[in-house]
Amino acid sequence: MKKTNIILSFVICILLYGCTDLSETVYTGVAMNDFFKNEKELVANAGRAYTKLQGYNSEQSLWTLLLQASDECAVPACGGSWYSNGRYEEIQTNKIPPANKLLTRGWNWIFNGIAACNEIIYETELSPIQFEGKEKIIAEMKILRAFYYYQAISCWGNVPFTTDYTETGYPEQKSREYIFNYLEKEINDNIEFLDREPSDTNYGPVSYTHLRAHETRHDL
């Protein structure tokens, strides 16, 4: 028995010694030190903010919410399976509880987009790589973030507001007026960096014409 305890203690000591090195190889993500080493990678990284736009006009999205609430369309129930827990009826009758799925999906879509823009701006500014289009990427992300925030204040008024990716707490709620004025300044400060004429090389990203269209709607 004594011999068994000695062997067991020896094995435990070996195992404990082997656990002191907690470093690991991560396969599910890319560390910032291993990426953003050239212009191509920074440009590709900015594309993540644009992929968020895909959810705008999907079913049960912010687009659907706005169409329903403005009476531009109506979604009838076709049998019990199409009633969708009454979420469309709630919007049509302007009796919308906080748990309505279109509200939560619209809210999440907006703030996922804002978070992506904040992260990309932070990563781009932090990168030591310098190239001609770097300021343009940052400007595009700021204008796209303004688009998302416009949707937020248009639908909800006062909302949590932050432009700091490193902020760990819950963002402070700001008034619609405060955010509106901030966005107006953000637009004016970044307009000079945007392409004014469409071309094969700038098709898709935020441009001067997009900004003007957004600014017009913003002012309305």
Regions found by a protein language model. Give the residues of each.
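Short, surface-exposed recognition loops and adjoining beta-strand edges that mediate ligand/DNA contacts
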Residues: 33, 60-79, 195-208
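Conserved small/polar residues in nucleotide/adenosyl-binding loops
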Residues: 209-218
